[in-house]
Amino acid sequence: MSKRVSAFGAEGDDEPQEKPMKPFISFSSNINNNNNSNNNNNNNNNNNNNNNNNNNKNNIGTGINLNIKNNNNINNNNNKSGFPVKKSRFNGEDDDDDYFFSNVPPKSSMTTLNKSPPNFENASSNNNNNNNNNNQESDSKNQNEDEDDEIDPLDAFMENVNAQAAIDNSKSIEKGQQQQQSLKSKRDDIDNEDDEEIFYKLRQKQLANKSSKQQQDDDVDYSSLDDDDGYFDDEESLKNGQSKGKRIIEPLPPIDHSKEEYIEFNKIFYEEHPDIANLTEEQVFEIRKNLDIRMTGTDLINPVTSFGHYGFDDILLQAIAKQSIETPTPIQKQAIPIALSGRDLIAIAKTGSGKTATFIWPSISHIMDQPYLEKGDGPIALFLAPTRELAHQIYLETLKYSKYFKLKTTVLYGGVSKQQQCKELKAGCEIIVATPGRLIDMIKLKATKLNRVSYLVLDEADKMFDFGFGPQVLSIVNHVRPDRQTLLFSATFKPNVEEFARTILSDPIKISIGMIGSANSDITQIVQVLKSDSDKWNWLTNQLALLLSQGSVLIFVSTKVAVEQLSSNLTKFGFQTCTLHGDKNQIERSQTIQTFKEGKINILIATDVAARGLDIPLIKNVVNYDTSRDIESHTHRIGRTGRAGNTGVAYTLITPKDIHFSVDLIKNLESASQFVPPELIDVAMNNPHFKRERGGGGGGSNRGRGRGGGGVGYRRNSRGGGVAFNSNRDSSRSDSQNKFIPAQSVEGGRLFNPNNTDNSEINNENEKSINNENKFSNNNSGSSNDRNSINYRNNSFNNNSNNTNNSGNSNFNNSNSNNGYSNNNYNNNYKNNSNYNNSNNNNNSYYNNNNSNNNNNSNYNNSSNNNNNNNNNYRNGNNNNNYNNNNYYNNNNSNNNSSNNNNSNNNSSNNNFNNNFNNNNNNNDNSNFNRALPFNDFNNNNNNSNNNNFNYNNNFNNSYNANNSNHYKNNNNSNNFNQRSQYNRR
């Protein structure tokens, strides 16, 4: 049944009709009548009979509901109008008629209608008649009167209705348009006054006020720089019309692990190699000491010395070889066995030491042992990083190895479309690298979950807590299954952060490589003390061309304004630069880094936003145009060069105003055996505390008074004189409690070499047969004492040291001539070792003798004239020092000559070593000896023949000539170790 359409729109229409329909008149059968009992021709279905009333209500179908009362008495016996009464125009659609006519507004009287002439244009006929009541007796018949042709009230009413309908229609259309406009403006108002947006704006304003009090345009505050997804995404900021500001990240709600179902997994994949298992405690101790490793914890695991000891799959070993990695770094030698053993770990190592690969390689073994992901599962390995740059760097490093095992890896950080990241997560991935805030967003959006995570890594964990991500990180960790494996890595680790980290770890092993927060010894630090800031510009413009000839240059400044200003000045000076700071969005940052990495532009000027996570091998020089806020940031700045065993140079420009930073910088230089310019010490002397520690009086007491030469150091002892550094600390104490034990330096000496002094102490413990003079001369390879070692490396800065250094070489030659051997301590020890034929004693002798050298591993390289490893030789003062030909150290020629004469008197140290080695190998099981050597990677086979030993020494002298494939394969063949087969995932 179709519905009628009214002039104003039928029920259910969305919009009113613009034109009214033509009115019609219908005598519907659905009429409510109040009739007399004498009504004979009333066919209505709904009749209400009243004995006292004789009123007939007429229904008029006009397209509008009407209810008109007629006060006249109407006799319905005869209808003379000519229109049918019982049959409606719509064939008796009573329900529709009743619906439309039920809401007709009542009219008081027909006399109130307009008396104007009727308009019959839209009327089908005139169906209203005025009847007269004859008031006759009750038994007489009712008679109908003729129509009143003068004025028809119905016509007048219809005309008024049509006019009113047109007016109402126009008003309705106008009102609809106003409502639409009102709704549109109202939605805009809601968007502008969104509660969440108001909260964010208020919070942003509060943070801005707080930040303005603490810092004026200082980029060093990471919480305002890194946009590390604790911030609005760029797309969200533009959408809401907001400037970039810190966003409040609510931690994840707690989770009840007892209600979760977790699959079983294995996290122990390490089987100790026989060569490592056979090492004695003394040998393990010496290996750790040589690698400068300190460990605390229970059930400590021995370090390895080669890749073959890990038990990695051949595919992973080949992937490592393709990266031109020849030997593990110190942290990799100790931390990877711990990670493969399923233990929780706290690892502290200097920047550029290979921390990233340390947790990536074990993660692949961990993942490949587990079942495949099912639909809806989250990742198996989760790597958290504080900044987007570091997260992206870890992601790229992970791809280098995961692609060979078809493991899907995804990175999550702010500034990237959430929609795309959700799509990648829902497709499934085994490894996620993420910043805490964006990961929380993805979990709340149900794009991923942490039900499968069993391998959790927090890189730069201390900075995550420093940035205020502690609650967020803790909530993420609490969403991971309790029996997970957790590893924390950082270049620095403050005691309060360490205490917090231990709450999320289970029986961890803590290892630290070198001094906590120390600089990388592969990086040469050169400090330039200038009179004023204006001198910095002159120095930079004079040196920049030379620095660019060596490779790309990274320049650090302290503020965003300074970045743009320095870039503009260098551009005017003819240099092409690119910039990186906190105001750059993610797209601009990525483009800048990519341009710099490809070498299209060789100068990058940046704030500390680039101090972490930027790994570009082309960077050969770092210039600290402005000093960093603290020494930790300085360590990360200079760590952008000299990465993964490569060498680099870092220049730091100091002015007299940098008093407090100079104090920390001196300690940093000393910890890495770097030269400390006297001018830098003069600046630091303006610090009262530093002056009390190292000031001029020398020292009979802790107050710096008494006789003896004034010196610099960490503490003074009761013997007076200068002081030296001793890093042999009790590992049972915390790092904050460890103190530096001074040692006596030469009379009047002001500088010292911490590493050499430390080695001399080791020699006192392990080699009583060699006097102190010999120990110093052997360690320094051409110096008679500690002071001369520093002068040998840096006498271009202090000409007065040359004479002393030459005298040191003279003493060195006399010492060696008495012994009849060259400058290799192990030659003397092999000569004097009566128990050489005993393999166990031989191992002990090897390590004890090796301690007398400045750097055990580099001694092998330095002893080899074929290595030409100039950078390492420079570190250890070898005769083949590349820097001897440089202007920096051109005064060392006399030292080298004396060393060369010494070598000629001894008929070549290497040949002496080989002869002694072969002569003492009669009837000896040399396989045990070779297993103890850290370079047994290069042994082809372990035989008992003297010929093989001679070949070993040849390989030893030319160790780096072996290619990578032989490096790994030969090691596996020599040990006959049962390697695990290819990974078979369940």
From Swiss-Prot:
The keyword Acyltransferase does not apply. InterPro entries: DEAD/DEAH_box_helicase_dom (IPR011545), Helicase_ATP-bd (IPR014001), Helicase_C-like (IPR001650), P-loop_NTPase (IPR027417), RNA-helicase_DEAD-box_CS (IPR000629), RNA_helicase_DEAD_Q_motif (IPR014014). Residues 696-723 have a biased composition (Gly residues). Residues 522-684 form the Helicase C-terminal domain. Residues 1-149, 165-192, 206-252, 688-986 are annotated as: Disordered. A motif (DEAD box) lies at residues 459-462. One of its GO terms (cellular component) is nucleus. This is Probable ATP-dependent RNA helicase ddx42. It comes from Dictyostelium discoideum. The gene is ddx42.
